[in-house]
C-alpha cells in the first residue's frame, strides 16, 4: 500500500502546459504557450553556449551578476531582488513562506492557474473574485478579502484574458486590503504594455512592505526553456524568500543568458513592436469573422466562440489542430467557450486567420 501524502495533495490537478503536438502532422505551429515569436536574443543564446565548458561548476547561489544586471536595467536595488526558476517557483516560495493551512487566498475570477496550485499545496483556501468584462475588479477583490486573507494574487496584465487594471486601481486595491495581507503582483507580461496608466507595481513595492512584484524571462526575453524569473520587494520579504529557496535554484546557463537578455534592449524593442503590430492584426481580422476578441495588451488574444453546434470553441480547437495549428483551450479557467492564441510570426498569424475563416464559413 502506497504511503499517503499530506491531506489535500491528491486533490491537486497537475498543471497542464500548452500542447506542442498535433496527431499525424509534422512540425505543427505551436501558438499555445505565449512564447516569444522572435525567439530569444542572439546575445543571450551566445552567453548560454559559453557556459558549456563550465558545467562541472556550481552556479553563484545568489545569482549576483543577474540581480545586478536587472537592477541596472530597471533602475532598482539589487538587494531587493531575488531570482528563481521561473516566476512560478517564486509564487510557490511565497506560498511556502506565508501560507498556513486554512488561510484564505484571493485571486481574480480568471487568474493564472498556478495560484490555485500554490494555495492547494499549502492547504489554503482559494476564493475567486468576479471579474467585470474579463478584467480584474478591485471592488470585488476587496469584498472577497477579509481580515483572514493572507495573500492576494493579482496577475496584471492577466493570463488568459490579456487585460490589465491601472496603477491607480492597483494602489486602491492595496490601500483597501488589511495590513496583514500580502499583495503579490504577477507582472509576467509587463514589458508588452505601453499604456500610460499602467505600471508593473514596482513603485508600490518600493514604498511598502506588503507588496511584491514577480517578473519572468519567459515572455519578452524568450528564455522559457531556461526557467528564469525574478521578484522585487521590501528587503524583509526578499530575505524570507532567500531562506526558503534552494541553495542553487538558478543554474549558470540561466544566469548568463538572463544577464545578456536584460541588457539587450534592442531585442526587447523589436519584440514589443512585433507584438503591437500583430496583436492588432489578429484582433481586427478575427473580429471581422464575427468572433469576439477580448482587447489584449499581451502577446496573445482570447477568442470567444458561440455555443452553436459545429462552431463551438471545442469544434474550432479540433479543426485548428487538424490543420496543424495548436492553440490553447481555456476551459480549466472557467472559459469553456473561448480559446487563447499566441501572437506568432507573420506567416503563423496569417495562417491562423485563414484557418479560422475557413472554419467559420464551413
UniProtKB/Swiss-Prot annotation:
In-chain residues carrying the UniProt-annotated modification N6-(pyridoxal phosphate)lysine: 219
EC numbers on record: 2.6.1.9
Organism: Maricaulis maris (strain MCS10) (Caulobacter maris)
Any single Pfam family the record assigns to this protein: Aminotran_1_2
Upper classification of the organism: Bacteria, Pseudomonadati, Pseudomonadota, Alphaproteobacteria, Maricaulales
A GO BP annotation: L-histidine biosynthetic process
Pathway: Amino-acid biosynthesis; L-histidine biosynthesis; L-histidine from 5-phospho-alpha-D-ribose 1-diphosphate: step 7/9
InterPro entries named among the record's database cross-references: Aminotransferase_I/II_large, HisP_aminotrans, HistidinolP_aminotransfase, PyrdxlP-dep_Trfase, PyrdxlP-dep_Trfase_major, PyrdxlP-dep_Trfase_small
Protein name: Histidinol-phosphate aminotransferase
Cofactor: pyridoxal 5'-phosphate
Reaction equations catalysed: L-histidinol phosphate + 2-oxoglutarate = 3-(imidazol-4-yl)-2-oxopropyl phosphate + L-glutamate
Similarity field: Belongs to the class-II pyridoxal-phosphate-dependent aminotransferase family. Histidinol-phosphate aminotransferase subfamily.
An MF annotation (GO) of this entry: histidinol-phosphate transaminase activity
NCBIfam families with a match to the protein in the record: hisC
Tagged with keyword Acyltransferase: no
Keywords per UniProt: Amino-acid biosynthesis, Aminotransferase, Histidine biosynthesis, Pyridoxal phosphate, Transferase
Subunit structure: Homodimer.
Ranges annotated as spanning the membrane: none
